[in-house]
Amino acid sequence: MPLPAGTTSEKYMNALDRVLDKLVKFKPEFLILSMGFDANIADPLAQFELKSEDFYEITKRTLKATNEFTNGKVISVLEGGYDLNALADSAFNHVNALVENN
């Protein structure tokens, strides 16, 4: 979902909800989450304004929307993030949402 530089958490979540609506119609049998944490506002390469806690919400919303079809079959791939503290916090939040899903 292409979004402009400076995208806030609220605008990102609104766009995510539109994507999830389409994903639900697709009814995936499994889910591959490719999580790039360089969208964190603290990241030197960030062009978005996402907070570490937003990655929990992104993961939670995605899993909630797809659990009915995937039965919890999820592969998570961790990608970029260049501020080590922001990367650690974002990944922690993402993994917490995955763990809570079980």
Predicted regions and their residues:
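A general "terminal functional-core" signal
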Residues: 1-102
